[in-house]
């Protein structure tokens, strides 16, 4: 019997400025899908068969960090797919991984290669848990723990960049000088901060 299940989860209020949503996908049949870029980096936990992306000639790892991409792509799996995905706002992933988001641009990186002990432990907990709703709660606890120490500073920096990104949505042809003014930063400071949070 063919079974497919797709479910979205809303992040807790504290994480909503950083996380767009979580989603879980389960299927016991082969997958052949065409996707469009959404502009958001993701952390992907493959509980079963990972996805193959021919445009990059890469099979995702069980724990994958997927950067922002500027191209559409195909996704293939042989069947028995089960994945949990954390979808970040374009500028937010770096605060959880302590790595500039720009380093993941157009890439699928093994989460294990980041040598992040707490992320690896989270992956183990997720892979050992059958209940995906509980897995989402594990993810949320991990995300909150990652921002607890530097929340005030990071929140201030995120608000500056978020204001600029909101303006880009309204006026796509806006100049960098105007954006830096909105963020109350010099052009050079703005470019550095914007690039560390986003690849847009």
Where are the regions that the model predicts?
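Extended amphipathic alpha-helical scaffolding segments in membrane-proximal extra-membrane regions
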Residues: 176, 193-194
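A secondary-structure capping/hinge motif
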Residues: 194-200
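Alpha-helical bundle regulatory/interaction domains
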Residues: 1-161, 166-177, 182-187
């Amino acid at each position: 019997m063919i079974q497919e299940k797709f479910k979205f989860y809303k992040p807790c209020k504290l994480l909503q400025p950083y996380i767009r949503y979580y989603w879980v996908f389960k299927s016991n049949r082969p997958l052949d899908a065409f996707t469009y870029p959404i502009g958001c980096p993701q952390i992907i936990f493959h509980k079963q068969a990972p996805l193959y992306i021919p445009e990059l000639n890469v099979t995702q790892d069980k724990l994958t960090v997927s950067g922002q991409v500027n191209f559409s792509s195909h996704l293939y799996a042989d069947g028995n797919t089960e994945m949990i995905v954390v979808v970040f706002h374009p500028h937010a992933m770096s605060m959880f991984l302590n790595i500039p988001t720009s380093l993941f641009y157009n890439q699928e990186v093994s989460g294990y290669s980041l040598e992040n002990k707490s992320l690896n432990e989270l992956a183990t907990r997720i892979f050992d848990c059958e209940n995906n709703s509980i897995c989402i709660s594990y993810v949320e606890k991990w995300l909150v723990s990652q921002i607890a120490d530097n929340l005030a500073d990071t929140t201030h920096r995120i608000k500056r960049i978020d204001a600029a990104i909101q303006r880009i949505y309204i006026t796509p042809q806006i100049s960098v000088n105007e954006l830096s003014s909105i963020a109350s930063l010099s052009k050079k400071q703005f470019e550095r901060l914007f690039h560390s949070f986003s690849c847009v």
